[in-house]
């Protein structure tokens, strides 16, 4: 945005006081100032919420001015997708009459988000979680292998569903070393930071955040390097694992080979590697072995363990202005907390996460300057206006009938399964309205529906169709949002008639066979319980106890040698073990296929929006008179 455009905005605000500030004066972004955007974790719930945020930032002409993009977990899934879209748009520019690349415009950024809105949701609705189980061989490898985990598998599915379309070489993953953006009008090897200091169209410095189990530090993947970010004021004695530049001439051939093998999808999988759900993502051979030949195995888990908001990266990059879009979970008050072992452990972990989140917010507040950050979350509300209706409160509870939509939305699962249109559009709409409200500090979201000052014309975003349901059928909307909290059996809540009907049809021949061959069932029961289980259960208990003892001696040199020996035979390419575990792998694949073929479709169909009632968008317009008319609507 130019100085003239900013002055025009200020003049409009003076003429039309009811409109409020489209972009606060502190966001005028003087030359050299850096704008940072943090996209929090929270599974696909967060990813979809952030799409609405990106849409409004593009309309307000701020998205092109983002210097630093920090992402965590679900924010990394969508952040990487946006980054690749932008990379493609900037590197593949059309040529003008003189054969020179045409410079991008603000409209390009709006168009990018419009493509993301439809393409990303389509990929989400394929049900990534279940697609990860479709390959029986991959399932078998995940059971026995020490170097192929659920995190490795989900990285492959991320690549297939989201990122493979951007690969220069079809069928190959995108390596981290290929992430650098070189706009069509710039020479290769240019200095991105120097370019950003003067350019109107920034190249965002992407920080994909994970957490190192080795040291407890923040691990970051960027387009130029990877590794741990040392603390400015360390208080412990653990030394962080050093950052490695992809272009470092001192790298060994083994390190260069490993860096070429690490793909963007692995970085995203590490960032979204929720502990206890996914196995830590392991990186072997990244660092040279120790003096005695000890291997350093980097083990990475979800970036949200360290900082689920992604704020630390913005502070490390010394951003002057910061936006944090927070779609992470919220801690509920509890009048009578459960005091059993597991609930106490879970509650304690949630309290710790809340404390870290509060510290991130405090760090933003303590930055120099006044009002140099925007922080909003899923339980914030916005006032709305007749054209852009608010989501009903209260924000801290829900009666399950006709209020508490914000609370229900904040409790939607943070899973990697399919999200219905109702769920996805409501999340996008909420992010869209919240970023508008918190940027403008306006009491009626007057800027929504009015032209974007200095920016691109607004678009008829698909997610705005949810406004019709908010206006006319709040009860039906709430019922959909309440179903969204369940991890399993959602089709049976969303459309019980179809789900149970299909289930009975599928079970009927099985039940008939069991009835006809009841004698066979009895014999099978005796074989499994009285013979196999009778002998295998004690052996399994003894084995588990032995394993626990061995793990307790994990640091003993002799035991480390034993583990290293076992790892040689637990490699993912061991054909004998693949054959041994193929049967359970095939069973998992069959369950996934059944879910995707039938139940996933039932859930998505139940969550479709009803036909539009013609709730049209405001047409783009220009000038104070049109802005005032929109504000007074």
Positions of predicted regions on the chain:
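Catalytic domains of lipid- and phosphate-ester/thioester hydrolases
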Residues: 1-633
């Amino acid at each position: 945005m130019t100085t003239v455009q900013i002055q025009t905005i200020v003049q409009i605000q003076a003429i039309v006081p009811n409109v409020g500030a489209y972009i606060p004066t502190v966001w005028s972004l003087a030359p050299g100032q850096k704008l940072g955007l943090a996209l929090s974790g929270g599974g696909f719930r967060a990813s979809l919420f952030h799409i609405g945020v990106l849409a409004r930032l593009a309309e307000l002409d701020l998205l092109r001015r983002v210097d630093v993009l920090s992402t965590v977990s679900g924010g990394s899934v969508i952040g990487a997708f946006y980054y690749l879209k932008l990379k493609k748009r900037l590197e593949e520019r059309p040529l003008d009459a003189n054969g020179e690349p045409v410079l991008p415009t603000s409209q390009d950024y709006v168009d990018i988000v419009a493509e993301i809105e439809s393409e990303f949701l389509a990929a989400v609705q394929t049900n990534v979680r279940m697609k990860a189980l479709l390959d029986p061989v991959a399932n078998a490898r995940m059971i026995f292998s020490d170097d192929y985990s659920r995190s490795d598998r989900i990285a492959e599915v991320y690549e297939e569903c989201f990122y493979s379309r951007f690969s220069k070489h079809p069928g190959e993953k995108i390596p981290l070393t290929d992430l650098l953006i070189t706009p069509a009008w710039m020479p290769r090897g240019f200095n991105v930071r120097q370019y950003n200091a003067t350019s109107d169209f920034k190249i965002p410095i992407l920080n994909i955040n994970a957490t190192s189990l080795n040291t407890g530090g923040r691990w970051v993947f960027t387009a130029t390097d990877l590794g741990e970010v040392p603390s400015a004021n360390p208080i412990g004695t653990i030394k962080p694992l050093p950052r490695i530049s992809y272009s470092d001439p001192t790298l060994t051939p083994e390190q260069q080979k490993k860096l070429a093998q690490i793909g963007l999808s692995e970085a995203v999988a590490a960032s979204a590697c929720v502990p206890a759900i996914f196995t830590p993502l392991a990186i072997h051979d990244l660092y040279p072995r120790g003096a005695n030949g000890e291997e350093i195995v980097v083990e990475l888990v979800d970036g949200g363990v360290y900082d689920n908001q992604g704020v630390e990266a913005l502070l490390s990059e010394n951003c002057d202005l910061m936006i944090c879009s927070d779609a992470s979970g919220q801690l509920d008050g509890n009048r009578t907390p459960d005091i059993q072992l597991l609930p106490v452990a879970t509650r304690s972990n949630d309290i710790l996460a809340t404390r870290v989140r509060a510290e991130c917010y405090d760090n933003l507040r303590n930055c120099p300057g006044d009002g140099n950050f925007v922080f909003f979350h899923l339980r914030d509300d916005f006032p709305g206006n007749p054209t852009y209706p608010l989501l009903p409160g209260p924000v801290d509870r829900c009666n399950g009938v006709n209020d508490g939509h914000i609370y229900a939305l904040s409790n939607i699962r943070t899973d990697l399964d399919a999200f219905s249109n109702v769920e996805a559009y409501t999340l996008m709409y909420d992010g869209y309205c919240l970023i508008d409200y918190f940027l403008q500090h306006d009491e009626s979201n007057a800027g929504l529906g009015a032209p974007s000052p200095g920016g691109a014309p607004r678009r008829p975003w698909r997610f705005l169709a949810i406004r019709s349901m908010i206006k006319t059928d709040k009860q039906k909307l709430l019922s959909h949002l309440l179903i969204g909290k369940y991890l399993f059996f959602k089709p049976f809540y969303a459309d019980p008639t179809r789900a149970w009907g299909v289930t009975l049809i599928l079970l009927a021949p099985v039940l008939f066979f069991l009835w006809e061959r009841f004698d066979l069932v009895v014999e099978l029961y005796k074989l499994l319980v009285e013979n196999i289980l009778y002998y295998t259960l004690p052996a399994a208990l003894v084995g588990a106890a032995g394993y626990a003892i061995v793990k307790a001696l994990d640091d003993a040199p002799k035991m480390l040698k034993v583990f290293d020996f076992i790892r040689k035979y637990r490699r993912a390419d061991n054909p004998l073990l693949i054959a041994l575990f193929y049967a359970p792998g095939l069973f998992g694949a069959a369950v996934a296929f059944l879910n995707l073929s039938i139940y996933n479709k039932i859930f998505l169909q139940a969550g479709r929006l009803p036909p539009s009632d013609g709730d049209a968008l405001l047409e783009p317009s220009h000038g104070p008179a049109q802005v005032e008319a929109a504000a007074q609507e």
